[in-house]
Amino acid sequence: MTTIKTTVILFFALVINMAAAPAFAIQLDLMPGTQTVAPADTASLDIVISGLGAGSAPSLSSYDLEITYDDALLTPTLVNIGDPGLGDQLDLFGLGSIVSVTPGVGLLSISELSLDLPSDLDLLQADNFILASLTFTTLGVGNAAVGFGNVILGDSFGLPLAADVNGATIAIRNPVNGVPEPMTWALLLPGLAWLRGRRFRV
């Protein structure tokens, strides 16, 4: 009987703790959500994560993202890893992380793996920050959608994290003064890059 009572007490204690635990709604956004630029101009987007723990778990130790875009209207030219104000939050002490940027047709794959300790990530990582900043060159006139394909996020121990995602739209418009559309550029994209730098020309 004592064993049964103990089991019941532990069960209800677990339920109460789960109910009291904070709920984290992790989100990935491409920001700004909308912008207007001219043909043969550049457009920049930030990949922003929010909803992580503030000085506690969950934190982010890895991500593997597919960024989809309209290759008839856009071509990626630059990827900057990390937050320009906070620094790379997966490389808290500047000791390096494992980064990959792989361009493809209408697809840009970006991944990073932190080498920091789980306890450091949980305690010191910001609860929202920029993962990477993307720069595109515009090729024509129209509305270019940029979004997320496959998304894999790992917490400080590498366990999966779920997140809601929101894409962006780049409106490409001719100047109102009627200047003829400039000739578009055709850029050759390099292959896989395993680098520790923080800037990637694609």
Sequence positions of predicted segments:
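Ser/Thr/Pro-rich, low-complexity mucin-like regions
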Residues: S133-A163
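Structured beta-strand segments within beta-sheet-rich domains
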Residues: D46-G51, A57, D88-G142
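A short, hydrophobic C-terminal helix/tail in secreted or cell-surface proteins
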Residues: P180-R198
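Low-complexity, serine/threonine/proline/glycine-rich extracellular segments that form mucin-like
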Residues: G33, A38-F93
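Terminal edge beta-strands and adjacent linker/stalk segments
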Residues: L159-R173
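Bacterial N-terminal signal peptides that target proteins for export
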Residues: M1-I9
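Cleaved targeting-peptide boundary
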Residues: A23-M31
